[in-house]
Amino acid sequence: TTKGRKREHYQLNLDIIAEESVAAEAEVLFAAVSALRKMGVPDEAYRIRVSNRALLSELLLSLGVKEQFHQGAFIALDKKGKIPREQIEAILREEGLDDEACTAAFNLMDISSLEDAEKLAGEGSPAIKQIRELFALLDAYGIGNQAVFDISVIRGLSYYTGIVFEAFDTKGEFRAIFGGGRYDNLLSTIGGEAAPAVGLGFGDVVVGELIKALDLPSTEQNELVIIGYMADEQRVAATQLAARLRGEGKAVS
């Protein structure tokens, strides 16, 4: 195993189904930041890198790369920094890109700002608009300083369709703290009813290592209260009691 990766781990997930707007992305990211704050992790200890697969598709199309090759290009470009450039370009060629397109696609990963991306994609880019809307909502949540644009964030799984994101510690010591994005086609692909969706996942291992590295004090454990009832007519009273105790900050089951 490698640092931050175990043979067995717990993953915490949060998903929002049936919301098309980037309000869903903003909400799950705010929930993630809130959770890290609850654990005592300071905001300055990490940054959330945000991109949009739709933007990368727009840019690939502008280079003359046909849409049928985009998924393979995503998988290859996601390996930047993990394997040598020559191997990535070899994968791109296997996916049908010629030498010129391979070089151009790889160079897209050097785009350093949203403004530079917009110059290539054009001012009317729907993907750029989505990113700007997301950043505006993150500002409204008070976590705008946590997020930065990073076109190299692609995510290796093929089901992502739009906004994608990953959070990394600012010292660069660990794997991603959490990651996720939009997957509007996944539910229908696996046989369910079509619905837009956004989700993120936390791995407990990296979060635990980050907390240790920051030497954070143990957080207080909420008092756990278990409420039982013997008859259905007691359900209302039990529910009212549970609501009151939760309002006092207690964990209730």
Model-identified regions with their sequence ranges:
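Positively charged, Gly/Ser-enriched RNA/tRNA-binding surfaces
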Residues: T1-P42, E86-S253
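Short terminal or interdomain "cap/linker" segment that borders an active site or interface and mediates
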Residues: Y46-E89
